[in-house]
Structure formats: C-alpha cells, structure tokens
Curated annotation (Swiss-Prot):
This is Glutamyl-tRNA reductase. The record marks H95 as: Important for activity. During catalysis, the active site Cys acts as a nucleophile attacking the alpha-carbonyl group of tRNA-bound glutamate with the formation of a thioester intermediate between enzyme and glutamate, and the concomitant release of tRNA(Glu). The thioester intermediate is finally reduced by direct hydride transfer from NADPH, to form the product GSA. Belongs to the glutamyl-tRNA reductase family. NADP(+) binds at G185, S186, G187, E188, T189, A190. Gene3D superfamilies: Glutamyl-tRNA reductase, N-terminal domain (3.30.460.30), NAD(P)-binding Rossmann-like Domain (3.40.50.720). Possesses an unusual extended V-shaped dimeric structure with each monomer consisting of three distinct domains arranged along a curved 'spinal' alpha-helix. The N-terminal catalytic domain specifically recognizes the glutamate moiety of the substrate. The second domain is the NADPH-binding domain, and the third C-terminal domain is responsible for dimerization.
Length: 424
C-alpha cells in the first residue's frame, strides 16, 4: 500500500482555480466512482472545502491523479499542474496529519477541518471506496490529530473562518445589536456564523436556504425569518450584512441585484461576505459605492492578526507531528508481523488446550494432582520449545550467527542470563 495525498489549497492556488475543482455534494458519489475506475487507484477518499480539494488514495501511480482531476473538471493539465501537490508515503501521512490537526489551515488550529475530513472518510467508507488499506490509516490519523491538538493547545479558544467573518463585521460596524443580517446557506459555516453573531448581540436574522428545513432549524435556534433562495431579491434591501455560504455551482447574486437593493435602501452601506467556493456573489458587485464585498481570500490578512499565540502552539504541534509520524511508521511496520503473531498464538493456544484436557482427564480418573501438574508442565514446555529447538539447531549447523543473534533477541536470553548471574 502506498498512501498518496494529492490536491491544491489556499496556499498553492487562488480562489478562481480552487472553485473550478471544488467538489459539489451532488457530484461526490460519481467522482469517487470515476476515480476508482482508474486501474491504478485501489482505494480513495476526497476532501473538498472552501480552502482545499484533496484526494487521499492508495496508488503506485500518483501522476494519474492530476490527469484525472484536470479531465473531470475540464481543465488544462498544464495549468492545473502549476498549483497541484503530490505527497507520497511518509510525506503523504505527514501532510494529512498536518491538515487534520489544523496546521495547514488558513486559520491555524481551526477545528472544522478534522470534522470535514471525518465526513469525507465516512462517506467514502459508505460508498465502498475506502476499505482495508486506507481505513486503518485514517483511523490512526484521527487519533493522532486529536492527541496533537490536545497536547499542543493549538485548538484553544476556537477560531474559524466563520469567527473571522464576525470579527470583520465588528471592524466595520460599531454596534452588532442594530444589525440586520441576511444569512444565505444553512451548512456548517453558516451555522457557525449565526452562532457567533448571536453571541455578539445580533437578533435580527433573515435565513435563506435551498433546504427550507435546515433554515428553519437555524431560525429556531437563533431567531429570525425563514426564506427560500427565491426570496433573496425581495428581502435583500433589508439587510445591512449579507453572508453567503452555499454550495451552488454558479453565482446567484449579481451587480444589478445589489444595485437595486441599494436604491431601495437609499444607498445605506451594505456589507457582503462570500464564504462560498465556488463564489455565490459576482466579483463586480464590489464596483458599487457603499458596498463592501469580501470573499474567503480577503480574510487572509485579517486572519494573520491575532494568531501569534497560536504560532507558539503550532511549533509544539509540529514537533508532535514528527513524533506521531515515527509512531505511525513503527505501527505500520508492525502490521507485517500481525499474521505471524496470530498464527503463532493460535498454535500455542491449541497445544496448551490439548495438554490441559489431557491433564484434566487424568485428575478426573483419580491420579495425584501434583504428579499430573508436574507432567503437564513438562509436556507443555517440551511441545512449545520443540519446533524452535529444531530450528535453532539447524541454524547453528548452518553457521548462521546472525539468526542466532536474532533468536537471542526474540527469546530475550541475554536479559535472562543477566538476571541469573545477578541472582547467583
């Protein structure tokens, strides 16, 4: 098994490239199936967020991943290769550990990425594209990333893209309490935005979603009016703040729509934050006066501020990554001995049960228990050591001193000899 992590993120690709390869929920099953149709790919999972699209798979031919990604999204392979990274084996595990721990996020230490990776893994398991090879790798990564976050404290005082959005609103508006907020989308990011805004004193929400039931749940939790996506033009003029975080493939808020809303607001300022990838709001909306439009890339400069306390934690987390990586390598190597250990233990258990049943029959027949137990002990020792004894004699006859040293190590005879000498 060769673990490979391949993809692009906010560090390697601008938003106009990331949105072209972003995985839409409706496409997830078909893309995973298409990926597994490649004869070179044995197992795979795909993670897609606003800041990254990554493929985790078992393959000996990682170069096919870039070709597949370009073909599926109708992009030039030459163009995509400028932004793509491929990490194999140990480096692939290290990269995935860094992602799961929040070390590779735009906002260092943000906790959402681990949940998103778990969801991607669980979906791939349900679809059958993750099986016996990748399953233990992901499970180890999830356990290790939890240890890293706990020990380093990198997840203390949780911060996310959603929280950064709320902080940005606070810089532009002095009073949260007077704001009317139009929240478009009802997923995890939208829920976090609503939660943080509510904690800061916002009580006037308009909540629109393609799934009305999800919008109603948000409205019940934080208060507000539930709308459908089709209601956006009618209610947009009422919003001081518009935050959009849907999974729509194309923008649905354009310049003319916002311009019309401004006219009805008597050109009172509007703050629009597009947290979606692909974008929900056309970029030329920012050309309008009294409109402040930001997308996820615009949050980068703000995110850097106030992260100093996390940078120290990140340094410690990086050290823990190396330690966990060493642990993973040892654990993965140990898997090669798993079948041998199981077979050996089963063999020893069978021998022990045979001798135990023989001894119990003799005791039931009235023989002296002490004599039976002495015989049981001697016979068990002889049977357990019979094959190893024959093997040791053979390697001694063959003058294989290296194998004799290995036997001493396995049977720990040096330690026992030292113990005997100490006692005598």
């Amino acid at each position: 098994m060769v673990f490979v992590a391949c993809g692009l993120n906010h560090k390697t690709a601008p938003i106009h490239v990331r949105e072209k390869v972003a995985l839409q929920p409706a496409m997830q099953d078909s893309l995973l199936s298409s990926l597994l149709d490649l004869p070179e790919v044995n197992e795979a999972a795909i993670l897609s967020t606003c800041n990254r699209t990554e493929i985790y798979c078992d393959t000996n031919t990682p170069e096919v991943l870039g070709n597949w990604l370009a073909h599926e999204h109708q992009l030039s392979e030459e163009l995509l290769s400028q932004f793509l990274y491929i990490h194999q084996g140990k480096e692939g595990i290290k990269h995935t550990l860094r992602v799961a721990s929040g070390l590779d996020s735009m906002m260092i230490g943000e906790p959402q990425i681990l949940g998103q990776m778990k969801q991607a893994y669980q979906h791939a398991c349900r679809l059958g594209t993750v099986k016996t090879q990748l399953r233990p790798v992901f499970e180890y990564i999830f356990r290790a990333s939890k240890r890293i976050r706990t020990r380093s404290g990198i997840g203390a005082n949780p911060v996310s893209i959603a929280y950064a959005a709320v902080q940005l609103i606070g810089q532009l508006f002095k009073n949260y309490h007077s704001l009317s907020v139009f929240l478009i989308g009802s997923g995890e990011t939208a829920s976090l935005v609503a939660k943080y805004l509510h904690q800061h004193g916002v009580h006037r929400f308009l909540i629109a979603s393609r799934t009305l039931e999800n919008a109603q749940k948000l409205a019940e939790t934080f208060g507000g009016k539930t709308l459908s996506i089709g209601d956006i033009p009618q209610y947009l003029p009422l919003a001081d703040v518009v935050i959009s975080a849907t999974a729509c493939p194309l923008p649905f808020i354009n310049k003319s729509l916002v311009e019309h809303a401004l006219e009805q607001r008597n050109h009172a300022p509007m703050f629009l934050l597009d947290l979606a990838v692909p974008r929900d709001i056309e970029g030329n909306v920012n050309e309008l006066e009294q409109v402040h439009l930001y997308n996820v890339d615009d949050l980068q400069s703000m995110i850097e501020k106030g992260m100093n306390e996390r940078r120290n934690a990140a340094l410690q987390a990086e050290q823990l990554i190396e330690s966990e990586l060493d642990n993973y390598i040892r654990w993965h190597r140990s898997l090669r001995a798993k079948d041998v250990i199981c077979d050996y233990r089963n063999q020893m258990h069978t021998l022990a049960q045979q001798e135990l049943q023989r001894a119990l029959k003799k005791i039931s027949a009235g023989q002296n228990q002490q004599d039976v137990l002495n015989e049981f002990s001697m016979r068990l020792v002889n049977k357990l050591t019979h094959n190893p004894t024959i093997g040791l004699r053979q390697i001694a006859w063959d003058n294989r001193e290296d194998l004799l040293d290995l036997a001493r190590y396995l049977f720990d005879t040096t330690a026992n000899q030292s113990l005997y000498e100490e006692i005598s």
